Regions:
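A generic structural signal for short beta-strands and their flanking turns/coil linkers
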Residues: 94, 113, 160-162
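Non-catalytic DNA-recognition/assembly elements of restriction-modification systems
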Residues: 17-36, 40-84, 210-225, 229-259
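A short beta-sheet element
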Residues: 1, 9-11, 125-182, 204
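A short glycine-rich beta-alpha junction/loop motif
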Residues: 3-26, 156-163, 172-175, 190, ...
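Sequence-specific dsDNA recognition surfaces
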Residues: 75-87, 101-133
């Protein structure tokens, strides 16, 4: 239906010729009520999801933000800090290739848009991620630079050059550090130390290694992460409700248009 060589467009004539079911006003009112109900459910679930994220961060500040704990740099806590590979991704390959778009703004890993790559030997060892590795997005826009998430899983994956892999020693859990890195205060600090232009800001491995983190006892870190796990379960329920709302809306739309 669309035309045009530079960009696709639908003309007025084509649009005017489109047919659609014409329901009575009463039925239209019922449909509007159903759509509004789905929209309300969707908005509510998204608000709950955002509130749960805020809850985790506020709990972190409450437990560890009073200055009681000795601080150490990430460099002192890490056993290895390493850049990813600069090799180009492909549509096929042995290993999933994690890029900066796979790290979300809220500290998660998203796998809905991945590339692949083939590596071997020393290069694979340097760039491969294992369960518990902390991933840090070193180059991005100034607003997004410093995105941080933890890799969990046993599937072999490789990181791109815009990501720094951090492996921690026994003093700190990577998920604890990830929550710290995703605090609004930490993100503001990351923006302040990032070098470069607005659309291409950078934080190198030395600058990352110099960041100080409160080092609470492992037992207390684990207690906090137990709390995070319970909140994550609630978050999973919210995500499931969001998906269900989307499916319900699509199903209802298809049913109405096919009538």
């Amino acid at each position: 239906m669309s035309t045009g060589s530079t960009f696709k467009a639908i003309g007025k004539k084509v649009l005017s010729s489109c047919e659609m079911p014409l329901y009575s006003r009463e039925v239209q009112s019922q449909i509007a009520c159903q759509v509004n109900w789905i929209d309300d459910c969707l908005r509510s679930s998204r608000r709950q999801l955002s509130a749960l994220d805020d809850l985790v961060k506020s709990q972190f500040v409450e437990m560890f933000g009073d200055g009681e704990w000795t601080s150490k740099t990430i460099g002192e806590l890490a056993t290895d800090i390493r850049y990813g590979t600069s090799k180009k991704a492909t549509e096929c390959g042995k290993y999933t290739y994690l890029r900066m778009n796979n790290l979300t703004d809220d500290g998660k890993l998203a796998y809905d848009d991945v590339k692949y790559i083939d590596l071997s030997g020393d290069e694979l060892e340097k760039c491969q991620v294992v369960d518990g590795d902390l991933l840090f997005n070193r180059t991005n826009s100034r607003e997004k630079v410093g995105k941080t998430a933890v890799f969990h899983g046993d599937t072999s994956m490789v990181i791109a050059g815009y990501i720094i892999r951090v492996r921690l020693g026994e003093e700190m859990r990577s998920d604890y550090l990830s929550v710290f890195m995703n605090l609004s205060t930490t993100k503001a600090m990351l923006r302040s130390i990032a070098k470069g232009a607005v659309h291409q800001a950078n934080i190198n491995s030395k600058e990352l290694a110099a960041i100080k983190v409160p080092v609470a006892p492992i037992e207390l870190q684990d207690r906090f992460l137990d709390f995070v796990a319970r909140v994550d379960k609630l978050g999973f329920d919210c995500c499931r409700e969001i998906v269900c709302c989307g499916v319900l809306f699509s199903s209802m739309s298809a049913s109405l248009l096919c009538t």
